[in-house]
Amino acid sequence: FAMLGTFLAQDLFLFYVFWEAMLIPMFLIIGLWGGERRIYATLKFVLYTAFGSILMLAALIYLVLYTHGSSGYMTFDLRHLSGSQLPLNTQLWLLSAFALSFAIKVPMFPLHTWLPDAHVEAPTTGSVILAGVLLKMGTYGFMKLGFPLFPEAARAMMPVIMTLAVISIVYGACLALVQTDIKKIIAYSSISHLGYVMLGLASLD
């Protein structure tokens, strides 16, 4: 339900609510039905995602208040916010906050270290949800919010995003090759595969 809400939301506040709500089942799956180190894996997952959530919330509030100050109209509507004429410096700061939050979910190097632990400790069903659905939401966040809301900053940051994507591709593939645990192989190969996705997104102009 929360994932469907994230896809359908045309309101920034609703997007944020659904974005956070979709993480709750994964916390419970790992924390309640995970392996021996499930508490450690869950705590690491919570800390990483909470850091990203705080950054996104701060950027969201600033964007809405800035738009209200310049237009006199307070709204969370994405169509209205995407038309805001923000200075490049402001766009860069806001995109950085959103990008860090999304990059944690992807996850991109060097924000990836929660994923191998979460994969290993999660039950098989949790690993399937992680690899098959949840990780892709980070790339969707870039497409839905990051690039459309801050187009000038996105163009300026493309070289950085592409560099991190290439590092993720090579790093994830190399580590996947030397793993003996199937879940760790999936975790590191997912980092590599999603690096390709991010490289493709960053190649768009």
Feature roles, as predicted:
Residues I54-H112, D117, F142-V160, S203-L204:
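Juxtamembrane/interfacial segments at transmembrane-helix boundaries in multi-pass membrane proteins
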Residues A41-K44, A122-G132:
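Membrane-interface alpha-helices at helix entry/exit sites of multi-pass transporters
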Residues P116, G138-K144, P148-D205:
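Acidic, glycine-rich loop-and-beta core segments that form the ion-binding/anion-interacting portion
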Residues F1-M3, M22-L32, A97, S101-I104, ...:
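Central hydrophobic cores of alpha-helical transmembrane segments in multi-pass inner-membrane proteins
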Residues L8, L95-A99, I129:
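Hydrophobic alpha-helical transmembrane segments of multi-pass small-molecule transporters/permeases
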Residues F51, L115, K136:
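Conserved hydrophobic/aromatic pocket- or pore-lining residues that grip, position, or stack substrates
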